[in-house]
Protein backbone atom coordinates (compact mmCIF):
# COMPACT_ATOMS: atom_id res chain seq x y z
CA UNK A 1 0.00 0.00 0.00
CA UNK A 2 1.56 3.34 -0.98
CA UNK A 3 2.28 5.69 1.90
CA UNK A 4 0.94 9.13 0.96
CA UNK A 5 0.38 10.51 4.46
CA UNK A 6 2.37 13.67 5.12
CA UNK A 7 2.35 13.04 8.87
CA UNK A 8 3.34 9.36 8.78
CA UNK A 9 7.07 10.09 8.82
CA UNK A 10 6.45 12.72 11.51
CA UNK A 11 5.06 9.89 13.62
CA UNK A 12 1.55 10.96 14.55
CA UNK A 13 1.17 7.33 15.69
CA UNK A 14 -2.37 6.89 14.41
CA UNK A 15 -1.55 4.25 11.79
CA UNK A 16 1.54 2.27 12.87
CA UNK A 17 0.99 -0.48 10.27
CA UNK A 18 0.49 1.82 7.27
CA UNK A 19 3.75 0.77 5.61
CA UNK A 20 2.77 -2.91 5.83
CA UNK A 21 0.68 -4.39 2.98
CA UNK A 22 -2.87 -5.00 4.20
CA UNK A 23 -2.66 -8.75 3.64
CA UNK A 24 0.34 -8.85 5.97
CA UNK A 25 -1.47 -6.74 8.56
CA UNK A 26 -4.28 -9.30 8.64
CA UNK A 27 -1.76 -12.14 8.90
CA UNK A 28 -0.08 -10.49 11.91
CA UNK A 29 -3.43 -10.05 13.63
CA UNK A 30 -4.41 -13.64 12.84
CA UNK A 31 -1.16 -14.95 14.34
CA UNK A 32 -1.65 -12.93 17.52
CA UNK A 33 -5.23 -14.15 17.92
CA UNK A 34 -4.21 -17.74 17.28
CA UNK A 35 -1.50 -17.51 19.92
CA UNK A 36 -3.82 -16.02 22.55
CA UNK A 37 -7.09 -17.80 21.77
CA UNK A 38 -6.35 -20.88 19.69
CA UNK A 39 -6.07 -23.09 22.75
CA UNK A 40 -9.73 -22.49 23.59
CA UNK A 41 -11.49 -22.89 20.23
CA UNK A 42 -11.01 -22.43 16.48
CA UNK A 43 -10.14 -18.88 15.43
CA UNK A 44 -11.81 -17.97 12.15
CA UNK A 45 -9.96 -15.89 9.56
CA UNK A 46 -9.90 -12.17 10.37
CA UNK A 47 -12.55 -10.49 8.23
CA UNK A 48 -10.81 -7.56 6.60
CA UNK A 49 -11.99 -4.57 4.58
CA UNK A 50 -12.12 -4.31 0.80
CA UNK A 51 -10.99 -0.67 1.11
CA UNK A 52 -8.97 -0.32 4.33
CA UNK A 53 -8.55 3.48 4.20
CA UNK A 54 -10.79 6.46 5.03
CA UNK A 55 -13.01 4.39 7.31
CA UNK A 56 -13.14 6.45 10.51
CA UNK A 57 -16.41 8.29 11.11
CA UNK A 58 -14.88 10.26 13.98
CA UNK A 59 -12.02 12.76 13.95
CA UNK A 60 -10.34 14.58 16.82
CA UNK A 61 -7.95 17.44 16.07
CA UNK A 62 -6.19 19.90 18.35
CA UNK A 63 -5.48 23.59 17.79
CA UNK A 64 -2.16 25.37 18.16
CA UNK A 65 -0.40 28.54 17.10
CA UNK A 66 2.59 27.94 14.84
CA UNK A 67 4.55 30.75 13.20
CA UNK A 68 1.85 33.18 14.23
CA UNK A 69 -0.97 31.24 12.54
CA UNK A 70 -3.80 29.12 13.90
CA UNK A 71 -3.36 25.47 12.87
CA UNK A 72 -5.06 22.21 13.75
CA UNK A 73 -4.22 18.55 13.40
CA UNK A 74 -3.21 15.43 15.28
CA UNK A 75 -0.66 15.32 18.07
CA UNK A 76 2.71 13.78 17.35
CA UNK A 77 2.79 10.47 19.22
CA UNK A 78 3.53 10.88 22.92
CA UNK A 79 3.55 14.69 22.75
CA UNK A 80 1.25 17.72 22.65
CA UNK A 81 2.94 19.00 19.49
CA UNK A 82 0.32 19.51 16.78
CA UNK A 83 1.08 18.17 13.30
CA UNK A 84 -0.91 20.50 11.02
CA UNK A 85 -2.96 18.91 8.28
CA UNK A 86 -6.39 17.73 7.23
CA UNK A 87 -5.52 14.77 5.00
CA UNK A 88 -5.61 11.78 7.36
CA UNK A 89 -5.76 8.48 5.48
CA UNK A 90 -7.90 6.85 8.17
CA UNK A 91 -10.62 9.50 8.49
CA UNK A 92 -13.54 9.61 6.08
CA UNK A 93 -12.77 12.13 3.37
CA UNK A 94 -15.82 14.22 4.32
CA UNK A 95 -14.20 14.69 7.74
CA UNK A 96 -10.93 15.84 6.20
CA UNK A 97 -12.86 18.40 4.14
CA UNK A 98 -14.80 19.49 7.22
CA UNK A 99 -11.63 19.89 9.29
CA UNK A 100 -10.14 22.21 6.67
CA UNK A 101 -13.38 24.23 6.64
CA UNK A 102 -13.42 24.48 10.45
CA UNK A 103 -9.88 25.88 10.41
CA UNK A 104 -10.72 28.41 7.68
CA UNK A 105 -13.83 29.60 9.54
CA UNK A 106 -11.93 29.85 12.85
CA UNK A 107 -9.20 31.91 11.19
CA UNK A 108 -11.83 34.19 9.64
CA UNK A 109 -13.17 34.82 13.17
CA UNK A 110 -9.59 35.57 14.34
CA UNK A 111 -9.89 32.98 17.06
CA UNK A 112 -6.79 31.90 18.94
CA UNK A 113 -5.56 28.51 20.08
CA UNK A 114 -5.64 27.59 23.74
CA UNK A 115 -2.20 27.68 25.36
CA UNK A 116 -2.19 24.94 27.99
CA UNK A 117 0.90 26.35 29.73
CA UNK A 118 -0.51 29.87 30.12
CA UNK A 119 -4.17 28.91 30.27
CA UNK A 120 -5.08 31.47 27.60
CA UNK A 121 -6.80 31.30 24.21
CA UNK A 122 -10.15 30.11 22.82
CA UNK A 123 -9.85 26.80 20.95
CA UNK A 124 -8.60 23.53 22.41
CA UNK A 125 -9.89 20.80 20.09
CA UNK A 126 -12.52 19.96 17.53
CA UNK A 127 -14.39 16.65 17.40
CA UNK A 128 -16.15 15.65 14.17
CA UNK A 129 -18.71 12.85 13.73
CA UNK A 130 -20.06 11.79 10.33
CA UNK A 131 -23.12 9.78 9.31
CA UNK A 132 -23.79 7.24 6.60
CA UNK A 133 -25.56 9.99 4.63
CA UNK A 134 -22.50 12.26 4.65
CA UNK A 135 -23.80 14.68 7.30
CA UNK A 136 -21.39 15.95 9.95
CA UNK A 137 -21.58 17.12 13.57
CA UNK A 138 -18.86 19.63 14.53
CA UNK A 139 -17.93 20.11 18.18
CA UNK A 140 -15.60 22.91 19.29
CA UNK A 141 -13.90 22.39 22.64
CA UNK A 142 -13.16 25.61 24.53
CA UNK A 143 -11.87 26.31 28.05
CA UNK A 144 -14.57 28.90 28.74
CA UNK A 145 -18.30 29.26 27.94
CA UNK A 146 -17.69 32.65 26.32
CA UNK A 147 -17.08 32.22 22.58
CA UNK A 148 -17.28 35.65 20.91
CA UNK A 149 -18.25 35.52 17.25
CA UNK A 150 -19.83 32.06 17.45
CA UNK A 151 -22.71 33.09 15.16
CA UNK A 152 -20.25 34.35 12.56
CA UNK A 153 -18.35 31.07 12.83
CA UNK A 154 -21.51 29.02 12.27
CA UNK A 155 -22.44 31.11 9.24
CA UNK A 156 -18.94 30.86 7.75
CA UNK A 157 -18.66 27.11 8.37
CA UNK A 158 -22.09 26.34 6.94
CA UNK A 159 -21.16 28.31 3.82
CA UNK A 160 -17.91 26.38 3.39
CA UNK A 161 -19.35 23.01 4.47
CA UNK A 162 -23.13 22.84 3.89
CA UNK A 163 -23.12 19.16 4.90
CA UNK A 164 -22.55 20.22 8.53
CA UNK A 165 -25.94 19.71 10.23
CA UNK A 166 -25.02 20.74 13.77
CA UNK A 167 -22.35 22.72 15.64
CA UNK A 168 -21.81 22.26 19.37
CA UNK A 169 -19.56 24.02 21.87
CA UNK A 170 -18.13 21.74 24.56
CA UNK A 171 -16.65 23.49 27.59
CA UNK A 172 -13.60 21.86 29.15
CA UNK A 173 -11.91 24.16 31.70
CA UNK A 174 -9.63 21.47 33.16
CA UNK A 175 -5.90 21.48 32.56
CA UNK A 176 -5.80 17.80 31.66
CA UNK A 177 -5.38 15.54 28.65
CA UNK A 178 -9.13 14.84 28.52
CA UNK A 179 -10.54 16.18 25.24
CA UNK A 180 -14.17 16.74 26.24
CA UNK A 181 -15.72 18.39 29.25
CA UNK A 182 -19.13 17.73 30.81
CA UNK A 183 -20.92 20.92 29.67
CA UNK A 184 -22.18 21.68 26.17
CA UNK A 185 -24.05 24.38 24.28
CA UNK A 186 -25.66 23.77 20.91
CA UNK A 187 -24.76 26.63 18.56
CA UNK A 188 -26.55 25.32 15.48
CA UNK A 189 -28.80 22.36 14.63
CA UNK A 190 -30.02 19.50 16.84
CA UNK A 191 -26.75 18.74 18.66
CA UNK A 192 -26.32 15.31 17.09
CA UNK A 193 -26.04 13.50 13.77
CA UNK A 194 -28.15 10.49 12.78
CA UNK A 195 -26.49 7.27 11.66
CA UNK A 196 -27.86 3.83 10.74
CA UNK A 197 -26.51 0.41 11.76
CA UNK A 198 -28.17 -2.87 10.78
CA UNK A 199 -31.32 -0.96 9.86
CA UNK A 200 -31.51 0.82 13.23
CA UNK A 201 -31.07 4.59 13.55
CA UNK A 202 -28.85 6.13 16.23
CA UNK A 203 -28.34 9.73 17.32
CA UNK A 204 -24.61 10.35 17.76
CA UNK A 205 -23.45 13.26 19.91
CA UNK A 206 -19.92 14.43 20.62
CA UNK A 207 -19.67 12.25 23.73
CA UNK A 208 -21.45 9.13 22.44
CA UNK A 209 -19.47 5.91 22.43
CA UNK A 210 -19.96 4.66 18.88
CA UNK A 211 -17.77 2.38 16.82
CA UNK A 212 -15.66 4.44 14.40
CA UNK A 213 -15.80 2.00 11.47
CA UNK A 214 -19.40 1.82 10.28
CA UNK A 215 -18.85 -0.80 7.56
CA UNK A 216 -17.06 -3.28 9.79
CA UNK A 217 -19.28 -2.62 12.78
CA UNK A 218 -22.21 -3.93 10.75
CA UNK A 219 -20.15 -7.06 9.99
CA UNK A 220 -19.32 -7.40 13.70
CA UNK A 221 -22.88 -6.94 14.93
CA UNK A 222 -24.39 -9.24 12.31
CA UNK A 223 -21.95 -11.94 13.40
CA UNK A 224 -22.85 -11.37 17.07
CA UNK A 225 -26.57 -11.62 16.27
CA UNK A 226 -25.99 -14.74 14.18
CA UNK A 227 -24.19 -16.43 17.08
CA UNK A 228 -26.98 -15.44 19.49
CA UNK A 229 -29.54 -17.42 17.42
CA UNK A 230 -32.49 -15.29 18.51
CA UNK A 231 -35.97 -16.55 17.64
CA UNK A 232 -38.19 -13.82 19.10
CA UNK A 233 -38.81 -15.63 22.40
CA UNK A 234 -35.64 -14.72 24.29
CA UNK A 235 -34.86 -12.39 27.17
CA UNK A 236 -31.57 -10.70 26.33
CA UNK A 237 -29.14 -8.73 28.48
CA UNK A 238 -26.83 -6.24 26.78
CA UNK A 239 -24.14 -5.52 29.37
CA UNK A 240 -21.87 -2.48 28.92
CA UNK A 241 -24.47 -1.33 26.38
CA UNK A 242 -23.33 2.26 25.74
CA UNK A 243 -25.99 4.03 23.65
CA UNK A 244 -27.73 0.70 23.06
CA UNK A 245 -26.32 -0.27 19.69
CA UNK A 246 -26.14 -4.06 20.10
CA UNK A 247 -29.29 -4.33 22.21
CA UNK A 248 -31.42 -2.23 19.87
CA UNK A 249 -30.19 -4.18 16.85
CA UNK A 250 -31.15 -7.37 18.70
CA UNK A 251 -34.54 -6.14 19.95
CA UNK A 252 -36.55 -6.93 16.79
CA UNK A 253 -35.31 -10.53 17.07
CA UNK A 254 -35.98 -11.01 20.80
CA UNK A 255 -38.84 -10.95 23.31
CA UNK A 256 -37.20 -8.31 25.50
CA UNK A 257 -33.82 -6.61 25.90
CA UNK A 258 -32.33 -5.14 29.07
CA UNK A 259 -29.34 -2.85 28.53
CA UNK A 260 -26.98 -1.99 31.38
CA UNK A 261 -24.62 0.99 31.27
CA UNK A 262 -23.08 3.14 34.01
CA UNK A 263 -22.80 6.36 31.96
CA UNK A 264 -26.02 8.36 32.55
CA UNK A 265 -25.73 10.31 29.28
CA UNK A 266 -25.33 7.06 27.32
CA UNK A 267 -28.38 5.52 29.03
CA UNK A 268 -30.41 8.61 28.16
CA UNK A 269 -29.25 8.33 24.54
CA UNK A 270 -30.10 4.61 24.46
CA UNK A 271 -33.66 5.25 25.64
CA UNK A 272 -34.04 8.05 23.08
CA UNK A 273 -32.73 5.75 20.35
CA UNK A 274 -35.31 3.13 21.33
CA UNK A 275 -38.08 5.72 21.02
CA UNK A 276 -36.66 6.97 17.72
CA UNK A 277 -36.88 3.45 16.29
CA UNK A 278 -40.26 2.71 17.92
CA UNK A 279 -38.71 -0.19 19.84
CA UNK A 280 -40.92 -0.96 22.83
CA UNK A 281 -39.31 -4.18 24.08
CA UNK A 282 -35.99 -2.67 25.22
CA UNK A 283 -35.26 -0.89 28.48
CA UNK A 284 -32.03 0.55 29.80
CA UNK A 285 -30.66 0.65 33.33
CA UNK A 286 -28.08 3.14 34.59
CA UNK A 287 -25.81 1.00 36.75
CA UNK A 288 -22.36 -0.51 36.94
CA UNK A 289 -22.55 -3.71 34.89
CA UNK A 290 -20.84 -5.86 37.52
CA UNK A 291 -23.00 -4.60 40.39
CA UNK A 292 -26.26 -4.85 38.45
CA UNK A 293 -25.50 -8.32 37.07
CA UNK A 294 -24.60 -9.60 40.54
CA UNK A 295 -27.81 -8.18 42.02
CA UNK A 296 -29.97 -9.48 39.16
CA UNK A 297 -28.43 -12.94 39.44
CA UNK A 298 -29.16 -12.91 43.17
CA UNK A 299 -32.79 -12.04 42.43
CA UNK A 300 -33.10 -15.04 40.11
CA UNK A 301 -33.03 -13.41 36.68
CA UNK A 302 -32.39 -16.05 34.00
CA UNK A 303 -31.87 -14.47 30.56
CA UNK A 304 -31.57 -16.66 27.51
CA UNK A 305 -28.71 -14.71 25.94
CA UNK A 306 -26.15 -12.32 27.41
CA UNK A 307 -24.16 -9.94 25.24
CA UNK A 308 -20.95 -8.72 26.87
CA UNK A 309 -19.25 -5.76 25.16
CA UNK A 310 -16.85 -4.45 27.81
CA UNK A 311 -14.18 -1.77 27.40
CA UNK A 312 -10.59 -2.65 26.60
CA UNK A 313 -9.97 -3.68 30.21
CA UNK A 314 -12.46 -6.52 29.76
CA UNK A 315 -15.11 -7.76 32.18
CA UNK A 316 -14.65 -8.61 35.86
CA UNK A 317 -14.55 -11.92 37.75
CA UNK A 318 -17.67 -10.84 39.66
CA UNK A 319 -19.59 -10.09 36.45
CA UNK A 320 -18.54 -13.41 34.93
CA UNK A 321 -19.65 -15.23 38.10
CA UNK A 322 -23.00 -13.45 37.89
CA UNK A 323 -23.46 -14.46 34.25
CA UNK A 324 -22.72 -18.05 35.23
CA UNK A 325 -25.31 -17.90 38.02
CA UNK A 326 -27.93 -16.59 35.56
CA UNK A 327 -27.51 -19.75 33.43
CA UNK A 328 -28.10 -18.26 29.98
CA UNK A 329 -28.06 -20.61 27.00
CA UNK A 330 -25.51 -18.48 25.19
CA UNK A 331 -23.02 -15.74 25.98
CA UNK A 332 -21.84 -13.61 23.08
CA UNK A 333 -18.70 -11.71 24.06
CA UNK A 334 -17.63 -8.79 21.85
CA UNK A 335 -14.02 -7.90 22.60
CA UNK A 336 -11.71 -5.09 21.55
CA UNK A 337 -8.63 -6.60 23.23
CA UNK A 338 -7.55 -10.22 22.60
CA UNK A 339 -5.50 -10.37 25.81
CA UNK A 340 -8.37 -9.48 28.12
CA UNK A 341 -10.66 -11.71 26.05
CA UNK A 342 -8.29 -14.64 26.64
CA UNK A 343 -8.26 -13.88 30.37
CA UNK A 344 -12.06 -13.71 30.57
CA UNK A 345 -12.61 -16.82 28.44
CA UNK A 346 -10.29 -18.67 30.82
CA UNK A 347 -12.46 -17.48 33.72
CA UNK A 348 -15.59 -18.74 31.96
CA UNK A 349 -13.84 -22.05 31.22
CA UNK A 350 -13.11 -22.58 34.91
CA UNK A 351 -16.86 -22.26 35.54
CA UNK A 352 -17.68 -25.00 33.04
CA UNK A 353 -18.26 -22.90 29.93
CA UNK A 354 -16.77 -23.69 26.53
CA UNK A 355 -15.70 -21.23 23.86
CA UNK A 356 -17.31 -22.48 20.65
CA UNK A 357 -15.58 -20.19 18.16
CA UNK A 358 -13.82 -16.88 17.74
CA UNK A 359 -14.81 -14.62 14.82
CA UNK A 360 -12.38 -11.70 14.40
CA UNK A 361 -13.30 -8.56 12.44
CA UNK A 362 -10.77 -5.90 11.47
CA UNK A 363 -12.38 -2.63 12.54
CA UNK A 364 -9.07 -0.77 12.65
CA UNK A 365 -6.95 -1.28 9.51
CA UNK A 366 -3.46 0.25 9.65
CA UNK A 367 -3.41 -0.25 13.45
CA UNK A 368 -2.67 -3.18 15.76
CA UNK A 369 -6.21 -3.36 17.14
CA UNK A 370 -8.75 -6.04 16.23
CA UNK A 371 -12.28 -6.87 17.43
CA UNK A 372 -13.38 -10.43 18.13
CA UNK A 373 -16.77 -12.03 18.72
CA UNK A 374 -16.71 -15.14 20.90
CA UNK A 375 -19.58 -17.58 21.48
CA UNK A 376 -19.60 -19.27 24.90
CA UNK A 377 -21.88 -22.22 25.69
CA UNK A 378 -22.25 -24.85 28.40
Please tell me what each predicted stretch does.
Residues 73-76, 141, 270:
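Short, acidic/hydrophobic/Gly-rich beta-strand patch recurrent on exposed beta strands
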Residues 50, 120-132:
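Core structural elements
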Residues 2, 16-116, 133, 147:
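Extended interfacial segments that mediate partner engagement and assembly in macromolecular machines
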Residues 149-378:
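Rossmann-like S-adenosyl-L-methionine
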Residues 63-65, 130-132, 362, 378:
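Short, low-complexity Ser/Thr-rich regulatory SLiMs
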Residues 5-8, 12-15:
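Short cysteine clusters
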Residues 57, 136, 233-234:
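Nucleotide donor/acceptor-binding cores
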Residues 64, 128, 134-143, 201-205, ...:
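Short, aliphatic-rich beta-strand segments
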Amino acid sequence: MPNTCVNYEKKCGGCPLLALPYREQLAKKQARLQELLGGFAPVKAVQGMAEPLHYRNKAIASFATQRGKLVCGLYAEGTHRVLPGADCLLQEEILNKTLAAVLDAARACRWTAYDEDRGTGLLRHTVLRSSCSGKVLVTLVTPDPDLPGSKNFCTALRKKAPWVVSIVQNINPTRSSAVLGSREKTLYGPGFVLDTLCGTQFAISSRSFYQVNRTQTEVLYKKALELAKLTGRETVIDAYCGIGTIGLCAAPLAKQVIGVERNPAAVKDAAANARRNKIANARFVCADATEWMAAAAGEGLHPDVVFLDPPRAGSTPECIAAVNKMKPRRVVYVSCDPETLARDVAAFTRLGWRASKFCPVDLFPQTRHVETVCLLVK
